[in-house]
């Protein structure tokens, strides 16, 4: 995912800024969240370090899932394992009736060799695409799991006072092949069905910031493959064949006009990128075909459909104009991660209570996330948690980098944020502060 630049760096002292809850009952619950989050912080840090040192690729999160399940069971939470592969679902039923809230954390790591000098740095390896690779939590999922384990501890301590039910979703394979859909197909949203779902993601902006936006926050990501077919001939006689390389070059340029000239970028951004072109094996032979592979990113279902149609039209027409044929294949990936506008407005005061002015409405991100599938089922809110040391912005390396670093001071903020979202939603917190 590309880096998002936040607003000005906040002093850590600002983390104590709070907004008064809506009632005395809300105030008491908020105080309990903060107190238990502080008491649990050292344990959350220990979990995070353990998970970071023992990363596992998608659908191989056996150790992580076992750690999660054992912890949830120790809290007296109902636990189901093997959901959608290696997923874990926990259900905590509060002492008072109320809504059902789902909280989600993804568990998988990446095929990346860690370059961060930490005493708990990963030295793990695994087989990936037929070769041995290093494995690292280069996207912060170790933080996500530890935070949600901490939230489970906090809310379990508050069980008797909780006005509703909390469903904990520990999801496999967000980085691929995808774990949200298999979990849903395996009944993760059944018995009971959530009324809302919340999640967070570690992001390279300063600790003390939480970024969010109503509507499309992360893009849909679709695969693009175009095969341009021509007629092979000798390079000295191009007129006796059909050159697919020339056609492919024009298609690359033409695809950029889809975004720059045919889509209203002031309404909803879009990106079309060709990242791979293969064709021919000799410098003096015009090949019979060229293969182009790329990615399509859009931020609304309407633009997604429109961009797909325009890509097919542009590629086919340009190829035809040069006597070639273009076969276009679009593989649907994760849909848009869209925050429910009403839910976002309702819960914004909860975020401000945790980080004050550090709760920032952000610009969209053209990366993708399969939290989107959960948010298609019920209203959802996905937030970006700042994990870069405010005093050293140079540590803010992009997600998926072998240098990705997460400041552990963000963990307690993450626990407070997710727990507050759950408690405040169940309490029926009003829209205004």
List where the protein language model places each region.
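Histidine/acidic-residue-rich, glycine-tolerant segments that coordinate divalent metal ions
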Residues: 124-136, 142-143, 155-287, 394
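Divalent metal-coordination and catalytic microenvironments
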Residues: 51, 90, 103, 141, ...
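Acidic/His- and Gly-rich active-site-bordering loop/insert found
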Residues: 26-136, 143-163
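Hydrophobic beta-strand positions in extracellular immunoglobulin-like domains
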Residues: 92, 228-230, 296
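N-terminal secretory signal peptides that target proteins for export/translocation
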Residues: 1-5
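Bacterial N-terminal signal peptides
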Residues: 8-20
């Amino acid at each position: 995912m590309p880096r998002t630049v936040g607003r000005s760096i906040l002093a850590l002292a600002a983390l104590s800024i709070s907004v008064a809850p809506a009632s005395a009952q809300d105030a008491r619950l908020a105080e309990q969240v903060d107190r238990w989050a502080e008491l649990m912080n050292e344990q959350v840090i220990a979990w995070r370090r353990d998970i970071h040192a023992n990363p596992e690729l998608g659908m191989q999160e056996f150790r992580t899932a076992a750690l999660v399940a054992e912890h949830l069971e120790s809290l007296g939470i109902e636990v189901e394992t093997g959901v959608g592969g290696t997923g874990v679902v926990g259900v905590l039923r509060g002492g008072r009736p109320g809504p059902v809230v789902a909280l989600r954390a993804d568990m998988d790591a990446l095929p990346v060799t860690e370059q961060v000098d930490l005493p708990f740095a990963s030295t793990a390896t695994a087989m990936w695409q037929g070769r041995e690779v290093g494995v690292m939590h280069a996207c912060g999922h170790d933080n996500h799991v530890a935070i949600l384990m901490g939230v489970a501890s906090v809310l379990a301590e508050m069980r008797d006072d909780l006005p509703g039910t909390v469903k904990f979703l520990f999801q496999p394979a967000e980085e691929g092949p995808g774990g949200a859909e298999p979990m849903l197909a395996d009944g993760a949203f059944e018995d009971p069905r959530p009324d809302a779902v919340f999640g967070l993601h570690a992001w390279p902006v300063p600790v003390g910031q939480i970024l969010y936006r109503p509507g499309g926050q992360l893009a849909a990501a679709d695969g693009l493959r175009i095969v341009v077919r021509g007629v092979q001939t000798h390079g000295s006689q191009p007129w006796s064949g059909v050159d697919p390389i020339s056609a492919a070059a024009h298609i690359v340029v033409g695809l950029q006009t889809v975004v720059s000239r045919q889509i209203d970028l002031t309404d909803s951004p879009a990106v079309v990128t060709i990242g791979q072109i293969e064709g021919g094996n000799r410098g003096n032979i015009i090949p019979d075909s060229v293969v182009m592979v790329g990615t399509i990113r859009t931020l609304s279902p309407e633009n997604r459909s429109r961009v797909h149609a325009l890509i097919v039209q542009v590629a086919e027409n340009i190829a035809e104009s040069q006597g070639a044929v273009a076969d276009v294949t679009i593989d649907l990936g994760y849909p848009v991660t869209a925050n429910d506008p009403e839910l976002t407005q309702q819960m914004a005061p909860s975020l401000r209570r945790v980080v004050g002015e550090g709760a920032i409405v952000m610009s969209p991100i053209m990366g993708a996330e399969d939290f989107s599938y959960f948010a298609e089922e019920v209203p959802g809110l996905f937030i970006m948690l700042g994990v870069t040391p405010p005093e050293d912005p140079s540590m803010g390396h992009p997600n998926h980098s072998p240098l990705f670093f997460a400041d552990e001071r963000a963990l307690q903020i993450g626990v407070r944020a997710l727990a507050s979202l759950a408690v405040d939603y169940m309490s029926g917190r009003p829209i205004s502060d």
